Amino acid sequence: MSTARDERPNILVLCMDQWDVHMDLPPGVELPAIQRLVGAGVSLANQYCTVPQCTPSRAIMWTGQHAKNVGLWDNTNFAWTDVLDEAVPTVGTMLREQGYYTAFKGKWHLSHPERSSDALEGYGFSDYQSWGDNWGGPLQGEELDGTVAFETVDWLRHKRPRDRPWFLVSSMVNPHDIMFLRAGPDERPHANGAMAALTHPPQDLGFMREYDIELPGNFSDDLEAQPYGVRSYKRNTDWNYGRIPEGREDLWKVRRNYLINCLRMVDAEFQKILDELDRQDLWRSTVVVLTSDHGEMNGGHGMTQKGAIPFQEASIVNMTVVSPRGPSGDHSDAVGSHLDLATTFLSWAGLEQADIRERYPALKGRNLRPVLEDPRRSDPPRGSASAPGDGALVNWDGLNMLDPEWAIQGALGELAQLGHGPDRTLEDCLRVGETYGAPDMDKRTFFRAVSDGRHKLVRWFSPTRYETPRTVPELHATSDVALYDLLEDPGETNNIGDPSRPGYDEELVASMLKKLVHLIDTELGEDERPFDLDLFGTREVRYRPEDVATDAPAEEQPAEPGPGTTEQPGDAF
Protein backbone atom coordinates (compact mmCIF):
# COMPACT_ATOMS: atom_id res chain seq x y z
CA MET A 1 0.00 0.00 0.00
CA SER A 2 1.30 3.44 -0.87
CA THR A 3 2.27 5.85 1.86
CA ALA A 4 -0.54 8.25 2.75
CA ARG A 5 -0.19 11.49 0.84
CA ASP A 6 0.01 13.71 3.94
CA GLU A 7 2.83 11.58 5.35
CA ARG A 8 5.07 11.76 2.32
CA PRO A 9 8.28 13.67 3.04
CA ASN A 10 9.71 16.66 1.32
CA ILE A 11 13.00 15.81 -0.42
CA LEU A 12 15.97 18.19 -0.43
CA VAL A 13 19.02 17.20 -2.48
CA LEU A 14 22.28 18.97 -1.65
CA CYS A 15 24.66 18.26 -4.51
CA MET A 16 28.33 19.11 -4.75
CA ASP A 17 30.75 18.50 -7.62
CA GLN A 18 34.08 16.65 -7.86
CA TRP A 19 34.86 15.64 -4.27
CA ASP A 20 37.31 12.81 -3.56
CA VAL A 21 35.37 11.01 -0.84
CA HIS A 22 38.34 8.67 -0.25
CA MET A 23 40.61 11.47 0.94
CA ASP A 24 41.64 11.19 4.57
CA LEU A 25 41.20 14.70 5.89
CA PRO A 26 44.12 16.00 7.95
CA PRO A 27 43.68 17.17 11.54
CA GLY A 28 42.04 20.55 11.93
CA VAL A 29 39.67 20.39 8.95
CA GLU A 30 36.21 21.39 10.11
CA LEU A 31 33.16 20.73 7.94
CA PRO A 32 30.26 21.49 10.26
CA ALA A 33 27.45 21.03 7.74
CA ILE A 34 28.72 17.80 6.22
CA GLN A 35 29.72 16.42 9.61
CA ARG A 36 26.28 17.22 10.99
CA LEU A 37 24.57 15.39 8.14
CA VAL A 38 26.83 12.36 8.48
CA GLY A 39 26.20 12.30 12.21
CA ALA A 40 22.44 12.54 11.75
CA GLY A 41 21.95 10.13 8.86
CA VAL A 42 23.07 7.02 7.00
CA SER A 43 26.10 7.04 4.70
CA LEU A 44 26.88 4.53 1.96
CA ALA A 45 30.53 3.66 1.39
CA ASN A 46 30.11 2.33 -2.16
CA GLN A 47 27.86 4.72 -4.08
CA TYR A 48 28.94 4.78 -7.76
CA CYS A 49 28.26 7.70 -10.07
CA THR A 50 27.96 5.51 -13.23
CA VAL A 51 29.82 8.01 -15.47
CA PRO A 52 32.57 10.08 -13.80
CA GLN A 53 31.88 13.34 -15.63
CA CYS A 54 29.47 16.23 -15.11
CA THR A 55 26.81 16.05 -17.84
CA PRO A 56 26.52 12.25 -18.11
CA SER A 57 26.36 11.78 -14.36
CA ARG A 58 23.76 14.51 -13.92
CA ALA A 59 21.72 13.01 -16.73
CA ILE A 60 21.61 9.76 -14.77
CA MET A 61 20.84 11.52 -11.49
CA TRP A 62 17.90 13.51 -12.83
CA THR A 63 16.43 11.02 -15.35
CA GLY A 64 17.09 7.63 -13.78
CA GLN A 65 18.40 6.34 -17.12
CA HIS A 66 21.94 5.65 -18.26
CA ALA A 67 23.44 8.71 -19.91
CA LYS A 68 24.05 7.03 -23.26
CA ASN A 69 20.39 6.05 -23.44
CA VAL A 70 19.28 9.70 -23.23
CA GLY A 71 21.95 11.00 -25.63
CA LEU A 72 24.20 12.66 -23.05
CA TRP A 73 27.28 10.45 -23.18
CA ASP A 74 29.70 13.41 -23.03
CA ASN A 75 29.56 16.96 -21.68
CA THR A 76 27.23 19.40 -23.41
CA ASN A 77 30.26 21.66 -23.89
CA PHE A 78 31.39 19.52 -26.82
CA ALA A 79 30.06 19.79 -30.35
CA TRP A 80 29.06 16.12 -30.60
CA THR A 81 26.75 16.23 -27.57
CA ASP A 82 23.20 17.58 -27.78
CA VAL A 83 21.09 18.80 -24.87
CA LEU A 84 18.64 16.72 -22.88
CA ASP A 85 15.43 16.21 -24.85
CA GLU A 86 12.44 17.63 -22.98
CA ALA A 87 10.51 14.49 -23.95
CA VAL A 88 12.71 12.43 -21.60
CA PRO A 89 11.00 12.01 -18.21
CA THR A 90 12.97 13.51 -15.35
CA VAL A 91 12.76 13.26 -11.59
CA GLY A 92 10.96 16.60 -11.84
CA THR A 93 8.24 15.41 -14.21
CA MET A 94 7.82 12.06 -12.45
CA LEU A 95 7.46 13.60 -8.99
CA ARG A 96 5.09 16.23 -10.34
CA GLU A 97 2.89 13.36 -11.46
CA GLN A 98 2.87 12.19 -7.84
CA GLY A 99 1.70 15.59 -6.63
CA TYR A 100 5.05 17.08 -5.62
CA TYR A 101 6.10 20.65 -6.25
CA THR A 102 9.53 20.39 -7.90
CA ALA A 103 12.21 23.09 -8.08
CA PHE A 104 15.87 23.35 -9.05
CA LYS A 105 18.62 25.74 -7.97
CA GLY A 106 22.22 25.85 -9.12
CA LYS A 107 24.29 23.81 -11.55
CA TRP A 108 22.24 22.03 -14.23
CA HIS A 109 24.64 21.31 -17.14
CA LEU A 110 22.17 19.27 -19.20
CA SER A 111 21.15 22.01 -21.63
CA HIS A 112 21.71 25.73 -22.19
CA PRO A 113 18.88 27.28 -20.14
CA GLU A 114 17.68 30.79 -20.75
CA ARG A 115 18.09 33.38 -18.03
CA SER A 116 14.61 32.89 -16.67
CA SER A 117 13.03 31.32 -13.60
CA ASP A 118 10.94 29.24 -16.03
CA ALA A 119 13.97 27.93 -17.93
CA LEU A 120 13.63 24.34 -16.66
CA GLU A 121 9.84 24.04 -16.76
CA GLY A 122 10.11 21.80 -19.82
CA TYR A 123 12.23 19.47 -17.72
CA GLY A 124 9.82 19.40 -14.81
CA PHE A 125 11.46 21.95 -12.49
CA SER A 126 10.23 25.37 -11.42
CA ASP A 127 11.93 28.41 -9.91
CA TYR A 128 15.32 28.19 -11.62
CA GLN A 129 17.69 31.09 -11.03
CA SER A 130 17.08 33.94 -13.45
CA TRP A 131 20.81 34.53 -13.98
CA GLY A 132 21.38 31.28 -15.88
CA ASP A 133 23.41 28.12 -15.41
CA ASN A 134 26.57 27.92 -13.33
CA TRP A 135 27.98 25.02 -15.33
CA GLY A 136 31.35 24.93 -13.58
CA GLY A 137 33.75 27.31 -15.29
CA PRO A 138 36.92 28.58 -13.62
CA LEU A 139 36.26 29.76 -10.04
CA GLN A 140 32.47 29.56 -10.46
CA GLY A 141 32.18 27.69 -7.18
CA GLU A 142 33.84 30.50 -5.29
CA GLU A 143 31.86 33.13 -7.20
CA LEU A 144 28.37 31.64 -7.45
CA ASP A 145 27.75 28.98 -4.79
CA GLY A 146 26.90 31.68 -2.28
CA THR A 147 24.19 32.94 -4.62
CA VAL A 148 22.80 29.42 -5.01
CA ALA A 149 22.68 29.08 -1.22
CA PHE A 150 20.87 32.42 -0.97
CA GLU A 151 18.36 31.35 -3.64
CA THR A 152 17.81 28.05 -1.80
CA VAL A 153 17.23 29.72 1.56
CA ASP A 154 14.94 32.31 -0.03
CA TRP A 155 12.91 29.52 -1.68
CA LEU A 156 12.57 27.62 1.58
CA ARG A 157 11.53 30.76 3.40
CA HIS A 158 9.19 32.38 0.88
CA LYS A 159 8.32 30.07 -2.03
CA ARG A 160 8.04 26.49 -0.83
CA PRO A 161 4.46 25.20 -0.89
CA ARG A 162 2.68 24.61 2.40
CA ASP A 163 -0.13 22.47 0.98
CA ARG A 164 1.84 19.59 -0.59
CA PRO A 165 5.25 17.93 -0.43
CA TRP A 166 8.10 19.38 -2.41
CA PHE A 167 11.33 18.27 -4.07
CA LEU A 168 14.20 20.76 -4.27
CA VAL A 169 17.69 20.38 -5.71
CA SER A 170 20.37 22.77 -4.48
CA SER A 171 23.31 22.08 -6.78
CA MET A 172 26.65 23.69 -5.97
CA VAL A 173 29.78 23.87 -8.10
CA ASN A 174 32.48 23.40 -5.49
CA PRO A 175 34.78 21.63 -4.90
CA HIS A 176 34.83 21.65 -8.74
CA ASP A 177 37.08 24.73 -8.72
CA ILE A 178 39.94 22.23 -8.41
CA MET A 179 39.38 21.37 -12.09
CA PHE A 180 41.19 24.43 -13.43
CA LEU A 181 43.78 24.84 -10.68
CA ARG A 182 47.40 25.28 -11.71
CA ALA A 183 49.33 24.55 -8.52
CA GLY A 184 52.42 26.43 -9.67
CA PRO A 185 54.28 27.60 -12.78
CA ASP A 186 55.85 24.16 -13.17
CA GLU A 187 52.46 22.47 -13.55
CA ARG A 188 52.38 23.03 -17.29
CA PRO A 189 49.79 21.91 -19.83
CA HIS A 190 50.64 21.27 -23.47
CA ALA A 191 50.67 24.47 -25.50
CA ASN A 192 47.61 23.21 -27.42
CA GLY A 193 45.88 21.80 -24.34
CA ALA A 194 42.14 22.45 -24.58
CA MET A 195 41.98 23.74 -21.00
CA ALA A 196 45.35 25.51 -20.88
CA ALA A 197 43.92 29.02 -21.14
CA LEU A 198 41.42 28.38 -18.34
CA THR A 199 43.83 27.35 -15.61
CA HIS A 200 44.51 29.64 -12.65
CA PRO A 201 46.76 29.74 -9.57
CA PRO A 202 45.45 29.07 -6.05
CA GLN A 203 43.38 31.91 -4.67
CA ASP A 204 44.97 34.03 -1.95
CA LEU A 205 41.90 34.37 0.26
CA GLY A 206 41.73 34.92 3.99
CA PHE A 207 39.37 31.96 4.20
CA MET A 208 42.01 29.55 2.90
CA ARG A 209 43.92 27.39 5.38
CA GLU A 210 47.12 25.38 5.09
CA TYR A 211 46.94 21.80 6.35
CA ASP A 212 49.43 19.01 6.96
CA ILE A 213 48.82 17.19 3.69
CA GLU A 214 49.77 13.60 2.93
CA LEU A 215 49.74 11.98 -0.49
CA PRO A 216 47.58 8.89 -1.09
CA GLY A 217 49.08 5.43 -0.76
CA ASN A 218 48.76 4.73 -4.49
CA PHE A 219 50.33 8.05 -5.53
CA SER A 220 53.52 6.40 -6.78
CA ASP A 221 51.79 3.84 -9.03
CA ASP A 222 54.06 3.58 -12.08
CA LEU A 223 51.05 2.33 -14.12
CA GLU A 224 53.08 -0.55 -15.59
CA ALA A 225 50.44 -3.05 -14.43
CA GLN A 226 47.59 -0.92 -15.76
CA PRO A 227 45.91 -1.19 -19.17
CA TYR A 228 46.69 1.17 -22.02
CA GLY A 229 43.56 3.23 -21.33
CA VAL A 230 44.83 4.22 -17.89
CA ARG A 231 48.09 5.54 -19.31
CA SER A 232 46.20 7.34 -22.07
CA TYR A 233 44.05 9.06 -19.46
CA LYS A 234 47.20 10.19 -17.69
CA ARG A 235 48.54 11.75 -20.89
CA ASN A 236 45.19 13.38 -21.56
CA THR A 237 44.98 15.16 -18.23
CA ASP A 238 48.69 16.02 -18.16
CA TRP A 239 48.56 17.61 -21.59
CA ASN A 240 45.19 19.35 -21.39
CA TYR A 241 45.24 20.53 -17.77
CA GLY A 242 48.85 20.45 -16.60
CA ARG A 243 51.64 18.02 -15.85
CA ILE A 244 53.45 18.14 -12.52
CA PRO A 245 57.13 17.19 -12.96
CA GLU A 246 58.62 14.20 -11.20
CA GLY A 247 59.81 14.98 -7.69
CA ARG A 248 57.41 17.90 -7.17
CA GLU A 249 55.28 16.34 -4.46
CA ASP A 250 54.92 19.85 -3.04
CA LEU A 251 52.69 20.79 -5.97
CA TRP A 252 50.53 17.69 -5.47
CA LYS A 253 50.08 18.77 -1.86
CA VAL A 254 49.06 22.24 -3.02
CA ARG A 255 46.35 20.63 -5.13
CA ARG A 256 45.07 18.45 -2.30
CA ASN A 257 45.09 21.38 0.11
CA TYR A 258 43.17 23.51 -2.40
CA LEU A 259 40.54 20.78 -2.83
CA ILE A 260 40.00 20.72 0.94
CA ASN A 261 39.50 24.47 0.96
CA CYS A 262 37.01 24.21 -1.90
CA LEU A 263 35.12 21.67 0.19
CA ARG A 264 35.21 24.04 3.15
CA MET A 265 33.72 26.75 0.96
CA VAL A 266 30.79 24.61 -0.19
CA ASP A 267 30.28 23.32 3.35
CA ALA A 268 29.81 26.91 4.50
CA GLU A 269 27.06 27.34 1.88
CA PHE A 270 25.36 24.10 2.91
CA GLN A 271 25.45 25.33 6.51
CA LYS A 272 23.26 28.31 5.56
CA ILE A 273 20.67 25.88 4.19
CA LEU A 274 20.77 23.62 7.24
CA ASP A 275 20.31 26.67 9.45
CA GLU A 276 17.14 27.49 7.51
CA LEU A 277 15.84 23.95 8.02
CA ASP A 278 16.37 24.55 11.74
CA ARG A 279 14.55 27.88 11.68
CA GLN A 280 11.51 26.37 10.00
CA ASP A 281 11.58 23.05 11.87
CA LEU A 282 11.63 21.12 8.59
CA TRP A 283 13.76 18.15 9.65
CA ARG A 284 10.73 16.16 10.83
CA SER A 285 9.11 16.35 7.40
CA THR A 286 12.10 16.38 5.04
CA VAL A 287 14.52 13.80 3.67
CA VAL A 288 17.90 15.46 3.08
CA VAL A 289 20.24 13.84 0.55
CA LEU A 290 23.90 14.87 0.35
CA THR A 291 25.78 13.64 -2.70
CA SER A 292 28.04 14.58 -5.62
CA ASP A 293 27.97 14.03 -9.36
CA HIS A 294 31.43 12.39 -9.50
CA GLY A 295 34.77 12.24 -7.76
CA GLU A 296 38.29 13.56 -8.37
CA MET A 297 41.53 11.60 -8.77
CA ASN A 298 43.26 14.03 -6.40
CA GLY A 299 46.72 12.48 -6.72
CA GLY A 300 45.53 8.89 -6.78
CA HIS A 301 47.83 6.96 -9.16
CA GLY A 302 49.59 10.29 -9.73
CA MET A 303 46.56 11.67 -11.58
CA THR A 304 44.12 14.56 -11.51
CA GLN A 305 40.58 15.16 -12.76
CA LYS A 306 37.86 12.64 -13.65
CA GLY A 307 36.32 11.20 -16.81
CA ALA A 308 37.80 8.29 -18.74
CA ILE A 309 39.04 6.54 -15.60
CA PRO A 310 37.18 3.91 -13.54
CA PHE A 311 39.22 4.12 -10.33
CA GLN A 312 37.45 4.54 -7.00
CA GLU A 313 38.61 8.14 -6.51
CA ALA A 314 36.69 9.26 -9.62
CA SER A 315 33.71 6.91 -9.58
CA ILE A 316 32.64 6.64 -5.92
CA VAL A 317 30.73 9.60 -4.51
CA ASN A 318 29.50 10.66 -1.11
CA MET A 319 25.96 9.51 -0.31
CA THR A 320 24.45 10.53 3.01
CA VAL A 321 20.73 10.59 3.74
CA VAL A 322 19.05 12.11 6.77
CA SER A 323 15.51 10.77 7.00
CA PRO A 324 12.86 11.39 9.66
CA ARG A 325 12.51 7.60 9.78
CA GLY A 326 16.18 6.70 9.65
CA PRO A 327 18.91 6.17 12.25
CA SER A 328 21.63 8.66 13.09
CA GLY A 329 25.33 8.31 12.42
CA ASP A 330 25.11 4.92 10.73
CA HIS A 331 27.26 3.61 7.88
CA SER A 332 26.75 0.85 5.36
CA ASP A 333 29.11 -0.92 2.97
CA ALA A 334 26.18 -1.37 0.56
CA VAL A 335 26.80 -0.84 -3.14
CA GLY A 336 24.59 1.80 -4.72
CA SER A 337 24.41 3.55 -8.07
CA HIS A 338 23.26 7.01 -9.10
CA LEU A 339 20.97 5.10 -11.45
CA ASP A 340 19.03 4.24 -8.27
CA LEU A 341 18.27 7.82 -7.23
CA ALA A 342 15.11 8.31 -9.29
CA THR A 343 13.62 5.01 -8.12
CA THR A 344 14.48 5.85 -4.52
CA PHE A 345 12.92 9.33 -4.78
CA LEU A 346 9.72 7.78 -6.16
CA SER A 347 9.65 5.35 -3.25
CA TRP A 348 9.74 8.27 -0.81
CA ALA A 349 6.93 9.79 -2.88
CA GLY A 350 4.77 6.76 -2.05
CA LEU A 351 5.15 4.45 -5.05
CA GLU A 352 5.73 0.75 -4.56
CA GLN A 353 8.32 -0.98 -6.75
CA ALA A 354 5.64 -2.62 -8.91
CA ASP A 355 4.03 0.78 -9.51
CA ILE A 356 7.37 2.27 -10.51
CA ARG A 357 8.05 -0.53 -12.99
CA GLU A 358 4.58 -0.17 -14.52
CA ARG A 359 4.49 3.62 -14.77
CA TYR A 360 8.15 4.23 -15.63
CA PRO A 361 9.51 1.17 -17.45
CA ALA A 362 12.63 3.06 -18.57
CA LEU A 363 13.82 3.22 -14.95
CA LYS A 364 16.24 0.35 -14.30
CA GLY A 365 17.53 1.48 -10.91
CA ARG A 366 17.09 -0.26 -7.57
CA ASN A 367 15.31 1.16 -4.53
CA LEU A 368 17.90 2.22 -1.94
CA ARG A 369 15.31 3.51 0.52
CA PRO A 370 15.26 0.39 2.77
CA VAL A 371 19.02 0.38 3.29
CA LEU A 372 19.08 4.15 3.77
CA GLU A 373 16.40 3.98 6.46
CA ASP A 374 17.32 0.68 8.13
CA PRO A 375 20.82 -0.37 7.03
CA ARG A 376 21.29 -3.04 9.68
CA ARG A 377 18.16 -4.99 8.79
CA SER A 378 17.87 -4.43 5.06
CA ASP A 379 19.49 -6.38 2.25
CA PRO A 380 21.17 -3.94 -0.16
CA PRO A 381 19.61 -4.43 -3.61
CA ARG A 382 23.02 -4.45 -5.32
CA GLY A 383 24.86 -6.28 -2.55
CA SER A 384 27.68 -4.94 -0.41
CA ALA A 385 31.40 -5.24 0.11
CA SER A 386 30.81 -7.85 2.82
CA ALA A 387 28.13 -9.72 0.84
CA PRO A 388 28.71 -9.03 -2.88
CA GLY A 389 25.73 -9.03 -5.24
CA ASP A 390 25.05 -7.72 -8.73
CA GLY A 391 27.16 -4.62 -8.17
CA ALA A 392 27.08 -1.30 -10.01
CA LEU A 393 27.90 -0.42 -13.62
CA VAL A 394 30.34 2.38 -14.51
CA ASN A 395 30.70 3.50 -18.14
CA TRP A 396 32.76 5.73 -20.39
CA ASP A 397 31.97 6.69 -24.01
CA GLY A 398 33.39 10.21 -24.11
CA LEU A 399 35.09 11.34 -27.31
CA ASN A 400 36.84 14.18 -25.50
CA MET A 401 39.32 11.70 -23.95
CA LEU A 402 39.46 9.12 -26.73
CA ASP A 403 42.77 10.19 -28.27
CA PRO A 404 44.95 12.74 -26.44
CA GLU A 405 47.50 12.83 -29.27
CA TRP A 406 44.80 13.98 -31.70
CA ALA A 407 43.33 16.38 -29.14
CA ILE A 408 46.53 18.33 -28.61
CA GLN A 409 47.02 19.00 -32.29
CA GLY A 410 44.43 21.68 -31.51
CA ALA A 411 41.41 19.61 -32.50
CA LEU A 412 39.73 19.37 -29.10
CA GLY A 413 40.12 23.06 -28.37
CA GLU A 414 38.25 23.88 -31.57
CA LEU A 415 35.36 21.59 -30.63
CA ALA A 416 34.87 22.79 -27.06
CA GLN A 417 32.70 25.72 -26.11
CA LEU A 418 33.49 26.16 -22.46
CA GLY A 419 30.93 28.65 -21.27
CA HIS A 420 30.97 30.93 -24.29
CA GLY A 421 27.60 30.28 -25.86
CA PRO A 422 25.91 27.38 -27.65
CA ASP A 423 27.93 24.34 -28.60
CA ARG A 424 29.52 24.28 -31.99
CA THR A 425 27.53 22.39 -34.56
CA LEU A 426 28.39 18.99 -35.95
CA GLU A 427 29.53 20.77 -39.11
CA ASP A 428 32.52 21.90 -37.08
CA CYS A 429 33.44 18.24 -36.60
CA LEU A 430 33.73 17.95 -40.37
CA ARG A 431 35.86 21.10 -40.53
CA VAL A 432 38.14 19.81 -37.78
CA GLY A 433 38.36 16.49 -39.59
CA GLU A 434 39.55 18.28 -42.71
CA THR A 435 42.23 20.09 -40.71
CA TYR A 436 43.42 17.48 -38.23
CA GLY A 437 42.04 14.17 -39.44
CA ALA A 438 40.10 11.92 -37.10
CA PRO A 439 40.92 10.63 -33.65
CA ASP A 440 42.15 7.06 -33.63
CA MET A 441 38.97 5.00 -33.29
CA ASP A 442 40.99 1.86 -32.54
CA LYS A 443 42.28 3.14 -29.22
CA ARG A 444 40.96 1.21 -26.25
CA THR A 445 40.05 4.17 -24.06
CA PHE A 446 36.32 3.50 -23.55
CA PHE A 447 35.21 1.19 -20.77
CA ARG A 448 32.49 -0.80 -19.10
CA ALA A 449 33.18 -1.65 -15.46
CA VAL A 450 31.35 -3.50 -12.72
CA SER A 451 32.09 -3.25 -9.02
CA ASP A 452 30.36 -5.46 -6.49
CA GLY A 453 32.10 -3.87 -3.52
CA ARG A 454 34.72 -6.61 -3.25
CA HIS A 455 36.03 -6.82 -6.82
CA LYS A 456 36.04 -4.55 -9.87
CA LEU A 457 36.28 -5.72 -13.48
CA VAL A 458 37.02 -3.21 -16.24
CA ARG A 459 36.65 -3.93 -19.93
CA TRP A 460 38.63 -1.34 -21.92
CA PHE A 461 37.58 -1.25 -25.58
CA SER A 462 37.70 0.92 -28.69
CA PRO A 463 34.77 2.64 -30.41
CA THR A 464 35.00 0.01 -33.14
CA ARG A 465 34.28 -2.85 -30.69
CA TYR A 466 30.99 -2.08 -28.98
CA GLU A 467 29.84 -5.69 -28.93
CA THR A 468 29.41 -7.18 -25.44
CA PRO A 469 31.78 -10.14 -24.99
CA ARG A 470 30.15 -12.96 -23.02
CA THR A 471 33.05 -15.36 -22.55
CA VAL A 472 36.55 -14.84 -21.21
CA PRO A 473 38.19 -15.63 -24.58
CA GLU A 474 35.89 -13.10 -26.30
CA LEU A 475 36.68 -10.56 -23.60
CA HIS A 476 40.44 -10.83 -24.05
CA ALA A 477 40.14 -10.88 -27.85
CA THR A 478 38.29 -7.54 -27.98
CA SER A 479 39.46 -5.71 -24.89
CA ASP A 480 42.15 -4.79 -22.43
CA VAL A 481 41.10 -6.18 -19.06
CA ALA A 482 41.65 -5.03 -15.50
CA LEU A 483 40.50 -6.80 -12.35
CA TYR A 484 41.11 -5.49 -8.84
CA ASP A 485 40.54 -7.00 -5.41
CA LEU A 486 39.18 -3.97 -3.57
CA LEU A 487 39.69 -5.57 -0.15
CA GLU A 488 43.27 -6.73 -0.60
CA ASP A 489 44.22 -3.96 -3.03
CA PRO A 490 42.09 -0.88 -2.23
CA GLY A 491 44.48 1.34 -4.20
CA GLU A 492 43.82 -0.66 -7.40
CA THR A 493 47.48 -1.08 -8.29
CA ASN A 494 47.57 -4.86 -8.85
CA ASN A 495 45.78 -5.92 -12.03
CA ILE A 496 44.85 -9.60 -11.67
CA GLY A 497 42.80 -9.55 -14.87
CA ASP A 498 45.77 -9.52 -17.25
CA PRO A 499 46.78 -13.05 -18.36
CA SER A 500 50.38 -11.91 -18.80
CA ARG A 501 50.76 -10.86 -15.16
CA PRO A 502 51.31 -12.86 -11.97
CA GLY A 503 48.16 -13.58 -10.01
CA TYR A 504 45.86 -13.75 -13.03
CA ASP A 505 42.55 -15.26 -11.90
CA GLU A 506 40.55 -16.50 -14.89
CA GLU A 507 37.78 -17.95 -12.72
CA LEU A 508 37.24 -14.60 -11.03
CA VAL A 509 37.34 -12.81 -14.39
CA ALA A 510 34.59 -15.14 -15.62
CA SER A 511 32.49 -14.55 -12.50
CA MET A 512 32.77 -10.77 -12.73
CA LEU A 513 32.19 -10.82 -16.50
CA LYS A 514 28.88 -12.54 -15.84
CA LYS A 515 27.90 -9.66 -13.55
CA LEU A 516 29.03 -7.08 -16.10
CA VAL A 517 27.02 -8.69 -18.89
CA HIS A 518 23.96 -8.94 -16.65
CA LEU A 519 24.05 -5.21 -15.84
CA ILE A 520 24.64 -4.23 -19.46
CA ASP A 521 21.72 -6.40 -20.61
CA THR A 522 19.29 -5.30 -17.89
CA GLU A 523 20.25 -1.61 -17.54
CA LEU A 524 21.83 -0.41 -20.78
CA GLY A 525 20.06 -2.80 -23.11
CA GLU A 526 21.51 -2.92 -26.63
CA ASP A 527 24.94 -1.42 -26.03
CA GLU A 528 25.50 0.41 -29.30
CA ARG A 529 27.96 3.12 -30.21
CA PRO A 530 26.27 6.51 -29.63
CA PHE A 531 28.02 8.28 -32.52
CA ASP A 532 28.95 7.69 -36.16
CA LEU A 533 32.52 6.59 -36.82
CA ASP A 534 32.46 9.01 -39.77
CA LEU A 535 31.58 11.94 -37.51
CA PHE A 536 34.69 13.81 -38.67
CA GLY A 537 34.17 13.09 -42.36
CA THR A 538 37.21 10.82 -42.38
CA ARG A 539 38.73 8.02 -40.33
CA GLU A 540 42.26 8.92 -41.32
CA VAL A 541 44.67 9.43 -38.40
CA ARG A 542 47.04 12.13 -39.60
CA TYR A 543 49.24 13.04 -36.65
CA ARG A 544 52.71 11.53 -36.28
CA PRO A 545 54.69 10.97 -33.08
CA GLU A 546 56.99 13.84 -33.95
CA ASP A 547 53.98 16.16 -34.29
CA VAL A 548 53.17 15.60 -30.64
CA ALA A 549 56.71 15.58 -29.29
CA THR A 550 57.63 18.86 -31.03
CA ASP A 551 55.35 21.00 -28.91
CA ALA A 552 55.02 18.77 -25.85
CA PRO A 553 55.89 20.06 -22.39
CA ALA A 554 59.46 19.58 -21.28
CA GLU A 555 60.55 16.12 -20.19
CA GLU A 556 57.90 14.35 -22.28
CA GLN A 557 59.09 11.12 -23.88
CA PRO A 558 57.58 9.78 -27.13
CA ALA A 559 56.14 6.47 -28.17
CA GLU A 560 54.07 3.65 -26.89
CA PRO A 561 51.97 1.88 -29.52
CA GLY A 562 48.32 1.53 -28.58
CA PRO A 563 46.18 -1.52 -29.20
CA GLY A 564 45.32 -1.85 -32.85
CA THR A 565 47.04 1.40 -33.81
CA THR A 566 50.17 2.61 -35.48
CA GLU A 567 52.94 3.95 -33.26
CA GLN A 568 51.67 6.56 -30.85
CA PRO A 569 53.47 9.18 -28.80
CA GLY A 570 53.38 7.92 -25.40
CA ASP A 571 53.62 7.41 -21.76
CA ALA A 572 55.57 10.22 -20.22
CA PHE A 573 54.83 10.87 -16.62
Each language-model region and where it sits:
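C-terminal, low-complexity/hydrophilic appendages and adjacent surface loops
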Residues: 186, 312-313, 395-498, 554-555
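Long, internal low-complexity/basic segments
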Residues: 2-9, 13-16, 21, 43, ...
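A short aromatic-rich beta-strand->coil structural motif
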Residues: 11-17, 95, 107, 167-170, ...
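Short catalytic/ligand-binding loop motif for oxyanion handling, primarily in non-cytosolic enzymes
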Residues: 20-24, 53-58, 69-72, 102-104, ...
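Active-site-proximal cap/lid insertion segments
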Residues: 5-6, 18-28, 161-164, 172-285, ...
